[in-house]
Amino acid sequence: MPKIKTVRGAAKRFKKTGSGGFKRKHANLRHILTKKATKRKRHLRPKGMVSKNDMVLVVACLPYA
C-alpha cells in the first residue's frame, strides 16, 4: 500500500499537542490592522485549538501527525 501524502498547507498551519489536539493561529491578524481595535488584536494573538467538529478534516490532512 502506498504512503499517504500530507497536505503541506495543513502541515504549516497546525501543530499537534501532547494530548492529541491541534494548535492553530487565529485569522485576521496579517494586514489592515489600523482599523482593528487593540483589544481585538490582543485577543487574536494567542494560539487557538481546532474544534472537535473540524478534527476529522485536520487528521485526514495530516496522516502522520
Swiss-Prot record:
Q: Where is the signal peptide?
A: none
Q: Which Pfam families match?
A: Ribosomal_L35p
Enumerate the residue ranges of region (Disordered): 1-22
Q: Where is the composition biased (Basic residues)?
A: 10-22
Q: PROSITE patterns attached here?
A: RIBOSOMAL_L35
Cellular component aspect of the GO annotation: cytosolic large ribosomal subunit
Please provide the Gene Ontology terms (biological process) for this protein. Answer: translation
Keyword set includes Amino-acid biosynthesis: no
Is Ribonucleoprotein set as a keyword in this record?
yes
What superkingdom heads the lineage? Answer: Bacteria
Q: Which UniProt keywords apply?
A: Ribonucleoprotein, Ribosomal protein
Could you state a single Gene Ontology molecular function term? structural constituent of ribosome
**What's this protein's family per the entry?**
Belongs to the bacterial ribosomal protein bL35 family.
What is this protein identified as?
Answer: Large ribosomal subunit protein bL35
